Amino acid sequence: MIARLHLFLCLLAVLGLTACAEPKWASQEAVDAARYVEGPPTYITLYTVVNKSTGSGAHSAILVNASERVIFDPAGTWYHPKLPERNDVHFGMNDKALAFYIDYHTRKTYDTIEQKIYVSPEVAELVLRRVENYGAVGKAMCTNATSSVLTGVPGFESLRHTFSPKKLSREFGKLPGVTTR
């Protein structure tokens, strides 16, 4: 009984530490200056980082192309000094910044899967508002946050809440019209 209580308390402590987020809040001036508008068509791209040796999912993030293009990199470690960040949302995601983001995650030991789906401007704006309002995400909670943002969005109703990057990628890949590379 004491061993189970000890195990429970240790697990609770670990979960408590992973819930600690590091909020960042760039100034409105910095966000406005960095704003990047790709233009239509509007789309959502899911990025899943996969360990090459184990095949396990290591990270999830979403690129949102709406009235502006941003990346929601929950609990991520990626950083660019010229791109302002607000609670895991990086602004100014032009093609060069996006290539840098993908290159940062894709290494000798990791692959990055890119899954894109075209959506209506209204759906893209809804996802943009959801990522902007989500808040800072604690370590190891990236897919939890990503799936929470997408769950219930029109066209994404089949997605379930999950902590597994590979499971989210599999479900996302089943959506009609998704292209994967």
Give residue spans per PLM region.
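Bacterial N-terminal signal peptides that target proteins for export
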Residues: 1-9
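Short, well-structured alpha-helical interface segments that form or flank functional binding sites
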Residues: 56, 122, 141
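C-terminal motif of bacterial Sec signal peptides marking the signal peptidase cleavage site
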Residues: 16-19
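Second-shell loop/turn segments in exported
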Residues: 48-51, 58-59, 109-117, 128-137, ...
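Activation targets extended, charge/polar-rich intrinsically disordered C-terminal tails
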Residues: 21-28, 125-181
